[in-house]
Amino acid sequence: MSVIKMTDLDLAGKRVLIRADLNVPVKDGKVTSDARIRASLPTIEAALKQGAKVMVTSHLGRPTEGEYNEEFSLKPVVDYLKEKLSAPVSLAKDYLNGVDVNAGELVVLENVRFNKGEKKDDETLSKQYAALCDVFVMDAFGTAHRAQASTHGVAKFADIACAGPLLSAELEALGKALDKPERPMVAIVGGSKVSTKLTVLDSLSKIADQLIVGGGIANTFIAAEGHSVGRSLYEADLVDDAKKLMEKCDIPVPTDVRVATEFSETAPAVLKSANDIKDDEQVLDIGDVTAERLAEILKNAKTILWNGPVGVFEFPNFRKGTEVIAKAIADSDAFSIAGGGDTLAAIDLFDIADKISYISTGGGAFLEFVEGKKLPAVAMLEERAKQ
């Protein structure tokens, strides 16, 4: 995957526009989780250090496109950046006709979704973004799967379009896990529905030596083995797809499970064999024997890709399966990459972030990359690198 990298360029005196992912939760005008901004800081600092005239922009939330709405303003992000950076930081509201920015300064360009045509990858808007800079830096992996004006269109028209350090690292880590993985390669796919992850499962079944399934997805596989799953979340119409996947790839289906008669945080967990699920029960976690068997598989892996918990880990009574898996990944010597919102929440809960080789910042983009799809923003950077 050949793209121009920001780290290979001399940015001194250049107008640099960084498309970051600063889409953070905000409450009462304050940033409540700064993980994405923290991840973007080294890119911004590197450009400032080189003496560039730095602009950074992002989307935040889902405002009505083309309308300013203070609720979705990047002002809380600007306040946060002012605390963290020694350089001057300001917010520009109207910037499409030009921005005054000095070397060593940072101007945050207001929420891109306030601009009409952003989501449709409008050519006029893309050219306006491109005219603001000498170098465009795409550093928002989380939006790389969307062809929008600030992620894709601008890269087409900017004098130079390159990948920022975050995006470069993300692509390298995913390439290491998927293109030429060290074997055995084990993939874990959790989540509620097979239907939303069918392409991912299919794609990984061709790469992985073993494919671990969890959550509601595992219930469809338990049903495919001929067991009743009671009132569990599962997809009867995808049982045949599950059977086909089991023929193609080694999928260790849970042999014991934790069930409850209601979906509730206080419901007591009952541990039982997977062939003994009653009609009024629902599976909410894998059982101890299954968890230990999967931990052993992970212990021997050389590459691990983790997407999704294996149970309803938000409920303390149904947390154990995901905890055992998380600890096994943390203790493994394998190259491990994890991605997806629920996965990141589990990593935080069990405090293992420093034990995972690479944590992906992109939810949808991570899944589309794993599915083998071309990410439009990355494809455009590759295109520009050839010119």
Curated annotation (Swiss-Prot):
Pfam families: PGK. Transmembrane segments: none annotated. The gene is pgk. Keywords: ATP-binding, Cytoplasm, Glycolysis, Kinase, Nucleotide-binding, Transferase. Pathway: Carbohydrate degradation; glycolysis; pyruvate from D-glyceraldehyde 3-phosphate: step 2/5. The keyword Metal-binding does not apply. The lineage of its organism: Bacteria, Pseudomonadati, Pseudomonadota, Gammaproteobacteria, Enterobacterales. It comes from the Bacteria. One of its GO terms (molecular function) is phosphoglycerate kinase activity. It is found in: Cytoplasm. PANTHER family: PHOSPHOGLYCERATE KINASE, PHOSPHOGLYCERATE KINASE 1, CHLOROPLASTIC-RELATED. This is Phosphoglycerate kinase. One of its GO terms (biological process) is gluconeogenesis.
